[in-house]
Regions:
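Extreme N-terminal basic, low-complexity initiation segments
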Residues: 2-6
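Structural preference for solvent-exposed beta-strand-turn elements
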Residues: 7-166
Length: 166
């Protein structure tokens, strides 16, 4: 076998040349950390269909949060497919503690809610067994885009009357 290493930007590529050509297919399971932001962004769309969804606890919690907000969720668990519909013009802009406390990804609905409805109230997240994971980078970015943000009684209260710009 011959190994060649190429430096490509910050990523590396490993090229392997062997005596036999490799053929076939492999199944790559879905990623929770890729799916959660996509789910949060469905607040901005009218209809979304996602394939290869990993049905794990944080995904189920995010789906409960989206249902609470007002999005219809249809699961096809045997095929790892999700269908989401956002038919309401007015939806709930609150992400309550009971749903956000078990996963830090709940803060991801803040941007889409602000974008679409110009206001949001999202509980400070929990759910991390390895220590506190601050949301200050999210808040910093939203402030730079024009949001007014305050923390009160365990909630992030955000407003962007003129919308988010940037």
């Amino acid at each position: 076998l011959l190994f060649q290493r190429y430096k490509v930007s910050l990523m590396q590529k490993l090229l392997i040349k062997g005596k036999k050509e490799l053929k076939g297919n492999i199944y790559i399971s879905g990623s929770k950390n890729a799916t959660l932001p996509i789910l949060a962004s469905t607040i901005l769309a009218s209809e979304v269909r996602l394939l290869n969804v990993p049905f794990v606890k944080d995904i189920f919690t995010m789906l409960e949060l989206l249902k609470f907000i007002g999005i219809k969720v249809k699961m096809k668990r045997n095929k790892n497919i999700l269908e989401l519909k956002n038919e309401k013009k007015e939806i709930n802009t609150l992400a309550p503690y009971k749903l956000v406390k078990t996963m830090r990804a709940g803060v991801l609905v803040l941007g889409p809610l602000l974008t679409k409805f110009k206001k949001a109230k999202v509980s400070l997240p929990g759910g991390c067994a390895i220590g506190t994971r601050p949301v200050d980078l999210h808040l910093f970015a939203l402030k730079k885009l024009g949001a007014k943000i305050k923390i009160k009684d365990g909630y992030i209260i955000a407003e962007a009357r003129k919308g988010l710009m940037g």
